[in-house]
Amino acid sequence: MAIVSYHDLVYTEVLIIIPPGTSRHYPDPALTNLGFQQNQQVGSDYRDLYINPSPPKQILGISKDKYLSSQIYASAPAEQVHLNAATAFLQGLYPPLDEKTASETINNGSTIPAPLDGSQIPVIRAEDSNSPSSIWINGAKQCPGITRSQQQLSHNSTYTDKVDSTRSFYEQFWPLLRNVSDYEHKSNLSYENAYDIFDLINVGLIHNDSIRDAVTGENLLQLRTLADTHEFDRASNFHAHPNGRIDAISARTLSAAIISRINQTITSNGTNKFSLLSGGYEPMLAFFRLHDLTTPSPDFYGLPEYASTLTFGLFTEEDVTTFPDADEDLKIRFVFRNGSNPDRTLTAFPLFGKNEISLPWTEFLYEMSQLSTDTAGEWCKICNPSQKQKPLCSSFRSSYYTSSDSYDHGHGHKGISNAASGVVGAVVMLGILTAAAGGAFLFLRRRWERTGPVGSLLGTGVPRKGGIRSLTMSIGSERVRV
């Protein structure tokens, strides 16, 4: 197993999974003290790696001690558990300032100490479910197309066989859950609710002494394994629809968000140093499947542990003092850390069916954009929610939907409207340039200057994407710890 290092990391992006809190079975799950500590520990570990004096992988020009909102971007759904998880991470990344640094001196000579013992309060964008930006972190939420697809999955013979074969296993937990809403009837204890049952019992084992002796380690492992399988199948049921756009939607919108944040760093010459997206496990699982990460490691079939992180590092292997040239010097590496335990290291994995764990930025951008849904209008077209389900989509219906341009759930046909013509034109341009370069996209020297349609996440400096390509990939198996 090779050990890889590089000189100046100029950007890194992180996605946090839901931390250990109250069970998601109940409305408005909350972050527990344990969850806050775990996310704070992960933030502290990232600080040691990227920010502290003489770190192993330095983020170029980042503030060492004082949190600067101009350098750090953070976004989360407008839900308590996600916002608090992001806060905990960032307070680990930037711990309380010492008294001297935090104090201020005013004109009369008085020294004013900082409140909260110097704790730094990060700025986090709370994405309301009615905001166009809400789809990027979890594109599956309020997407009725997902519900229809998952209903198809529930009629699959393999799925129904699993429900039948595990029924007696689940029903043994009825004495524990009979007083929990939705489980008053034993019949609801089944594989169909695999994650919810695992979540209730797992959280209970952490916080409730009364059930510790009622669930064996073997039982918990089986509950976890069944939840792994159930949720992975739901997140990656790409064959329920011919081109898989619906079932991969959360991974595709997440891919667009990643492109957008990295591109923001490049177009600003590194002003934005670090971006944090706080979300749940569902887009993670879909991302693993969409980008075929299960081939280099079967661990990606399972649910990520609490406070797991995906990281996309934009870096250069050259010794630099100013922001590098995007076309020639910048590379991307994807790394994953499963959970918050200090012994869990960031591990690099290849993407897009390639063997290399580091790709030129332009190549990464091209590959990633093939598998992204980068406008709210496109999301609305794929998911086709009612105005009540997603009011924001009403603004796209007149320009993006026509009677002949509706999304055909039977054949996966996607018509071309005026609002999408900019995308199609750019696709043709991209195809011509790629062919002219002999397929060597990474050698292109010109930066693309094209503004996307209404609701575009990519903005300027990003080539528009092509059509949805086949998901039959072969990926290298090299795994590198960094």
Listing of model-derived features with the role each one plays in the protein:
Residues 2-71, 77-275, 281-482:
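Signature for phosphate-centric chemistry
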